[in-house]
Amino acid sequence: MAPPTCRLLSAALVLLLLLATNHQATGAVVASELRCQCLNTLPRVDFETIQSLTVTPPGPHCTQTEVIATLKDGQEVCLNPQGPRLQIIIKKILKSGKSS
């Protein structure tokens, strides 16, 4: 092959590889699941305002345990899993679950 043809073929190959890589990278759902959801945590939240708690254990997406509280107004907030208030809230939830 002549050098200009070789360069053109190389450029076309690089362009195709970039397009293929870019197409796979557009999966925003996958990308958002591969990082920690809780970048900041609230120091405290009232037990009465919590509708539900979601605990996500450490994994390949995040090395930390994450606790996300859904409040009665629909807002989701991150809580410190080591916080003493959260430990009290978890005990209250477990206690209320046993009594029902």
Swiss-Prot record:
The gene is Cxcl3. InterPro entries: Chemokine_b/g/d, Chemokine_CXC, Chemokine_CXC_CS, Chemokine_IL8-like_dom, CXC_Chemokine_domain, Interleukin_8-like_sf. It comes from the Eukaryota. Disulfide bonds join 36-62, 38-78. It is found in: Secreted. This is C-X-C motif chemokine 3. Its main location: secreted. It holds the Pfam family IL8. It comes from Mus musculus. GO terms for molecular function: chemokine activity.
